[in-house]
């Protein structure tokens, strides 16, 4: 409830001029020592950390201390049967099990303000489990970013029914980690930001991705696009759902 009213306050206090805004989430943090390289990126990048991983808790704590926004990268069952890793949610779990898993994972990753799904092409299609996930997130006053690993996702309807703040991933930046592949997606990010005003993109802590972003993130500012922590886009999303139409963009 407090988070909801905080977002309302942000909406009504939006300045009269705002730039196109982009949130970039770096997923899959926690297993590799090289993941720490994500902290070489600007602190407006959001880090999504896998629970119960060897380095996840330490990286989350260090990143928070350096001003990064932290999310929980919550493992969910996929259609292809790929192993979820510890803390995963599967379709054979009951309500108590799902809620307990979500709560424990949020506790494991310190300073997590929200969560997004790791895999989940099966689980996010199911109304009941996603409703339980959102109930748990609401209890912890956390937002959710739907990674959209299936077009049939029910995350949005579950979140809306409970008033859980939600965003949707609109672009994956690094399915192809060649320079050409990264450049293609980065140009698409800029184009989408100009067209839509706000974009949520997901990338991963691959060495190629980190190098590319370090070199190319300044292009956003040159294009009049502001890189922001993910939660900064929630008020705009809420305003659109409530029928409000901000007339200008944040500087």
Task: Enumerate the language-model features and the residues they cover.
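Sec-dependent N-terminal signal peptides
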Residues: 3-15
């Amino acid at each position: 409830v407090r988070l909801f009213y905080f977002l309302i306050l942000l909406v009504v206090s939006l300045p009269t001029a705002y730039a196109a805004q982009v949130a970039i989430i770096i997923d899959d943090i926690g297993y590799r020592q090289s993941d720490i390289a994500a902290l070489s990126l600007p602190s407006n990048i959001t880090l999504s950390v896998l629970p119960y991983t060897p380095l996840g808790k330490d990286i989350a704590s260090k990143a928070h201390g350096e001003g990064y926004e932290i999310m929980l990268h919550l493992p969910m069952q996929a259609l292809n049967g790929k192993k979820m890793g510890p803390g995963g949610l599967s379709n054979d779990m009951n309500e108590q099990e799902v809620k307990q898993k979500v709560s424990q994972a949020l506790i494991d990753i310190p300073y997590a303000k929200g969560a997004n799904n790791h895999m989940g092409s099966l689980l996010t299609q199911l109304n009941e489990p996603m409703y339980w996930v959102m109930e748990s997130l609401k209890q912890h006053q956390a937002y959710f970013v739907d990674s959209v690993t299936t077009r049939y996702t029910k995350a949005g309807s579950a979140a809306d029914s409970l008033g859980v703040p939600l965003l949707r991933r609109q672009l994956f930046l690094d399915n192809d980690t060649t320079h050409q592949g990264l450049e293609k997606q980065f140009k698409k990010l800029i184009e989408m930001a100009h067209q839509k005003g706000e974009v949520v993109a997901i990338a991963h802590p691959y060495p190629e991705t980190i190098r590319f972003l370090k070199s190319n993130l300044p292009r956003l500012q040159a294009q009049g696009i502001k890189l922001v922590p993910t939660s900064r886009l929630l008020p705009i999303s809420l305003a659109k759902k409530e029928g409000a139409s901000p007339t200008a963009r944040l500087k």
